[in-house]
Amino acid sequence: MTNADPHELQKFSDLAHRWWDPNAEFKPLHDLNPVRLGWIDAHAHLAGKRALDIGCGGGILSESMAGLGAQVKGIDLSTEALGVADLHSLESGISVEYEAIAAEAIAAREPGTYDVVTCMEMLEHVPSPGDIVAACATLVKPGGWVFFSTLNRNLKSYLFAVIGAEYIAQMLPKGTHDYARFIRPSELASFVRATDLHIVEIKGITYHPIGKRFALSNDTDINYLVACRRGA
């Protein structure tokens, strides 16, 4: 059985045609992308590396990693989003390979293949996030890097990421997030400990409304990033 929620898939498929519009529903991803890309590259040094972007959607991060010299494959279960990603790759001239396949399926097919595996803003949208973490650990080469980003589960994150972002500021479409699926850092750490990955760094992401920009911080109360490495 696929580790996916049909409602979640349909939600993002319906918006796929707007994925690359920096002023539409995915504006927060466009604004966030330089921060997460710089953080990933600082750890993994992407140039010349083979990277897999799990839950790539329309390819914002995938193309950015390829632009830094990585050989990138993006996977997603939304064929609509992948169609947009493919088209944008052709238009931009940045080469990325895309495939509609589940993380667990590609892990069974290509274990220990990638220098870098990214799974950003995805874990909070699937029924069994621990299985995705395990798949990431299988896919990465010994000594390779795995990166996650997700949302913490607490009152502050509910107020800011759901009520604030979706209903007050309208930065995101209503219903984008299901608070019950938010993941505490301790929970994500337990998923990681069940694999042969180890956590190297956890960083928060803070949004500055005056400048309308995201920045790395030590505040993990809402959005946070986790860098992991597989034992050599």
Swiss-Prot record:
Catalytic activity, reaction form: a 3-demethylubiquinol + S-adenosyl-L-methionine = a ubiquinol + S-adenosyl-L-homocysteine + H(+); a 3-(all-trans-polyprenyl)benzene-1,2-diol + S-adenosyl-L-methionine = a 2-methoxy-6-(all-trans-polyprenyl)phenol + S-adenosyl-L-homocysteine + H(+)
Q: Which Gene3D superfamilies match?
A: Vaccinia Virus protein VP39 (3.40.50.150)
GO molecular function terms noted in the UniProt entry: 2-polyprenyl-6-hydroxyphenol methylase activity; 3-demethylubiquinol 3-O-methyltransferase activity; polyprenyldihydroxybenzoate methyltransferase activity
What Enzyme Commission number(s) apply to this enzyme? 2.1.1.222, 2.1.1.64
Could you tell me the keywords of this UniProt record? Methyltransferase, S-adenosyl-L-methionine, Transferase, Ubiquinone biosynthesis
Q: Organism's domain of life?
A: Bacteria
Keyword S-adenosyl-L-methionine assigned: yes
Q: Name one Pfam family in it.
A: Methyltransf_23
Pathway-wise, it operates in: Cofactor biosynthesis; ubiquinone biosynthesis
Q: What residues does S-adenosyl-L-methionine bind to?
A: R36, G55, D76, M120
Looking up PANTHER family in the UniProt record yields:
METHYLTRANSFERASE, UBIQUINONE BIOSYNTHESIS O-METHYLTRANSFERASE, MITOCHONDRIAL
HAMAP family reported for this sequence: UbiG
**Biological role:** O-methyltransferase that catalyzes the 2 O-methylation steps in the ubiquinone biosynthetic pathway.
Under what name is this protein listed? Answer: Ubiquinone biosynthesis O-methyltransferase
